[in-house]
Amino acid sequence: MISKINGKLFADMIIQGAQNLSNNADLVDSLNVYPVPDGDTGTNMNLTMTSGREEVENNLSKNIGELGKTFSKGLLMGARGNSGVILSQLFRGFCKNIESESEINSKLLAESFQAGVETAYKAVMKPVEGTILTVAKDAAQAAIEKANNTEDCIELMEYIIVKANESLENTPNLLAVLKEVGVVDSGGKGLLCVYEGFLKALKGEKVEAKVAKIDKDEFVHDEHDFHGVINTEDIIYGYCTEMMVRFGKNKKAFDEQEFRQDMSQFGDSLLVINDEEIVKVHVHTEYPGKVFNYGQQYGELIKLKVENMREQHREVIRKEQHTAKPKMETVETAIITISMGEGISEIFKSMGATHIISGGQTMNPSTEDIVKVIEQSKCKRAIILPNNKNILMASEQAASIVDAEAVVIPTKSIPQGISALFQYDVDATLEENKAQMADSVNNVKSGSLTYAVRDTKIDGVEIKKDAFMGLIEDKIVSSQSDQLTTVTELLNEMLAEDSEILTVIIGQDAEQAVTDNMINWIEEQYPDVEVEVHEGGQPIYQYFFSVE
């Protein structure tokens, strides 16, 4: 029985919760409704939770209130994607509720889950049931009920998991699209993984990290960061040493804990990755030979690598002396836009964007990424263009915590971002610009062409893995094995008699022949529409389209 949770135990709950989510991130990703190759729910929740875990591991405290503040800060700054932001808000409310406590009992644990739900619902502009919010709400309500008749935090957490799982299984009945695709809510599943890790910690158990099959062609680590090293002489261990050892039958039996302890005596920056056949090692040492000799106790050395880091540092200094690093531009009003692809970034810069954050579909920037740009620009005012629905909440979270007066224009696509930026008036006030830029978003119809990462049926459209998909905003309107057929079906849906301008932004994977045939088709079918073509260079999406 566990009647009290202090900072030490809560830290272990966080660590085990983060590990369990990490182990199941791919499973959570697979539950995403849309088969688009983007920054998925599992990935974003995992990165967010990992940020919270790392902050906790670096600032341990026996006081649960103090540890909660640390955890909340790590989640807040590391939040990526809407699912990550909601996760951070759930625990922001949770941790706020315990900030004055040194330890908590089952009743306060239940009340804190409820406080987290209330905070998260307030943070979402239009809460949707059948999502992570519903699972969190149902679990918290169950916790409040159970806490009335148990003082055991283990028993309480077990009940929370049962009710959270029931709620998760019911999500398709609340959200039609989940039922159509045949999945439960991915965010709710991610939250359940965290709760299951919490229970493991309360029981004194550990969530083991998944052991991935090791790639025999790659070493553990290749690059060195000399940030903070002023003199070459400051480098204590001068040789970056790496080895791969294939375990031998008649050699010493491998015990990871013993292996790590022994290897740590040779130097620092130790990394050890192993599976059933091979162990990979990276360590900074003065004696590479001793490292290799130790490795031979376990089996055959199959790859070795030694780099002189002092010589690397001398080369870094030589290069820095010849290349002055440009400082981040400081401005009165920062116009910060999220971009994907060099061509798109150049378009934004030419239109007046002062700062570009690389991100978009495959890697959503965190709250901290956006905050850093605002702070380093030393601006008094900031306008943020997320250009992706999954970056919107992180942008709003960043705007709410910086000292500068910051606003977010709710752009959900690159074309919307371009249209909004076109409306920026250097002489207008921040609020005036916010109003006219936001208004322009409604005048643009956005489309895109990409490929499917799995078989599914959604919005009445049958989709096969690797087939092309045409989307208008978030709705899939066409999916064919032939790229040109998919594009023309998409454009027929987008273009109308009163359409005036079609903007085409070409991605890095677009084929020239398809582009040429597409332009010819547009000119034949829609001769009155003016066509503007730009090289965007964006990954994942062969084309972005906008119609005005």
From Swiss-Prot:
Pfam families: Dak2, FakA-like_C, FakA-like_M
Domain of life: Bacteria
One GO MF term: glycerone kinase activity
GO biological process, one term: glycerol metabolic process
Domain DhaL: start-end pairs: 8-200
UniProt cross-references to Gene3D superfamilies, sorted A to Z: 1.25.40.340
SUPFAM superfamilies: DhaL-like
NCBIfam families attached to this UniProt entry: FakA_VfrB (NF038248), YloV (TIGR03599)
Name recorded for this polypeptide: Uncharacterized protein SAOUHSC_01193
